[in-house]
Swiss-Prot record:
EC number: 3.1.22.-
Protein's job: Interacts with MUS81 to form a DNA structure-specific endonuclease with substrate preference for branched DNA structures with a 5'-end at the branch nick. Typical substrates include 3'-flap structures, D-loops, replication forks, nicked Holliday junctions and also intact Holliday junctions with a reduced efficiency. May be required in mitosis for the processing of stalled or collapsed replication fork intermediates. Plays a role in DNA repair and in genotoxic stress-induced homologous recombination (HR) in somatic cells.
Polar residues bias (residue ranges): 238-261
Protein name, UniProt field: Crossover junction endonuclease EME1
Species this chain originates from: Oryza sativa subsp. japonica (Rice)
Compositionally biased region (Basic and acidic residues): 221-235, 291-326
Protein family: Belongs to the EME1/MMS4 family.
Subcellular locations according to the entry: Nucleus
Stretches the record annotates as Disordered: 1-94, 107-168, 220-326
PANTHER family, alphabetized: CROSSOVER JUNCTION ENDONUCLEASE MMS4 (PTHR21077:SF5), EME1 PROTEIN (PTHR21077)
Amino acid sequence: MASHAAVVEIIDDDDDDDDDVAAASTPPALHKRSHAVAAAAPDSPDAFSPSPPDPKRRQLAASTIVLDDTPTPPKRRPPPVAADRSASVVADTPRSFVPCSLRNRAIAGDTPDSVLPSPSFHLDAPDSATPGSDVPCSVGLDDIVPETPGFNSPRLARPPAVPGLTSPMTARKFSGVSCPISLDSDDELDDTVYRESLTRTPSNMAKPEHAIQPCTTSCTDKVENTKSTDKKDYSKSNVGYQTNNSACKNNGTTSYNQPPRANSPCEDSTLKEADPFINNHCPQEENALPIEERKKKQQEEKRLKKEKKAREIEEKKQKRLETKKQKEAMKAELAELKKLEKEKKKWESGKLATKCIVAEIDSSVIESGSVGGHLVQGFHEKGLCFRVTSNSIKGSILWKMQIPNEFTQDQASTSQVPYILFVLQAEEFCDLVSGGTLLDHVQKVRRQYPEFTICYVTNKLMSFIKRREQNQYNKTTSNSNSWKRPPVEEALCKLATHYARVRSRHCTDEAEVTEHIVGLTYSLANCKFRKPLTWLSVHANGSNISKGCVDKDRIKKSAWLKSLVAIPGVSPGQAIAIEKKYPSMRSLLNVYMDDSKSVHEKEHLLEDLRLEGPLGDFKRRLGPACSKKVYTILMAQNGAAEVEVDRRGA
């Protein structure tokens, strides 16, 4: 299908010019765009000769013609080059647009006589910058170099850009198009070359000028620039003007200014379809964020991290404080428990008993007589607690123990001591005895306090009786109202014989009364925690040893001697005689438990032991009575049995 387009007529020069160019052309792999019949052979020395000076050519006018843009099948001829050298060519179609991929390969300029530099031949000389010719350069991914017809440039003798492609068929196979489009006449089909894809091979990567640079500029701008060139008028005859050799650098890729070329709408659509960068935004533009926004985001992240770190530090601090408080609380609780345990032990041992007992004194005791002042002073001096109250029975004193709450285990916090004391003046006691109401008084107290011990304390009783008797004796005449001595001794004996747990105490003055009551308070406080006394505990410390004994200290140091002395009827001398024969209780018990001996022999076992006299003689014997006592006590089955020794034997 033919279409009208503004194109440039390409007029070939004489063959002489082509011959001149052929002399400086590259090896046969690079076909010159001319009507020359033959080129220099690969092995010819002219193939690598330096380029001749640029020929002077006149400018030719071009006119607008109508071209058929239907592609014509190109003529393919075998390349006159060895199989190991592949030709790197550039499409020779003037004013044509070859769609290519901007991502995968670069587009070289459609210059008729230009070739791409080859990495196989290293010519470090700078490229020719002759006016009117295209100087080969490294073409970037985004560069589209238009072709300037009518001008030939000396070709550089360099190998193909992509080694490994040995034929135009292979080059076309790896190119991005199915077939190059030629807008020239039929006789120029012989000079049609094929575009090879600039793939990334090790040979291409060797030279930096053949490296394909990535697209760093906006692809949309290039498409817009390409569209803007369509509006230019190419009908002018001065199309093939001479360009200045000004190198432009585009992201590391060097290209030379070429005349602008318009793209048709179909070419623009083809370019958009072939180029993915036009349809999609560049990744760098898509991922790029404004600097201020990134800074704000970074600052926000830093602030959040800082707040998180501060929050974690604060949480750790709070945890440490809570742990510290818990440890302090546990430590304080343990200290309190230890203190409580210590106080409990003190309480159980009776060390705190005097601080817990309270004496309840009837007000009549404090108000009447001279005992009250001394009694209050005595309690204050000893640090004892007392309380003046009005008791149910006049003149009585009661005691109570205030047990601490932490020591009580299902017990009342206050316990009453089962003891009641009556402080009676001598005249009061004599009136009770004379009137016969003393025993009635005892019965009354017993009914109210049945389990209590009753004690009567009198003050100056005997002195009062003597004074009254003396006064009665000094009277001259007998009076019917004369005072008679009350039977005090008989009343006190009845209290001791007829009633249990009834005591009496006669004091000579107020100081003795105070001392007795204070001492009784101490005893009542500690008696609850005191071990009960037994016969053995009373005599175990050697209290029954006579004062005139010479070996008293020796007996107190030996438990075996103190045990022997505690037996009734065993003197210290007899105990020492037994200890000399049998130094321990076990040695004596072994003999007593011997079954081979009879009971009679065991009873008389110790009777022949000799006692040491005052002068050191051993004339006296222990005797059968003492021997039987020792045997009876040590071999008794009942510990409460009394020792009653029969002199006649067992």
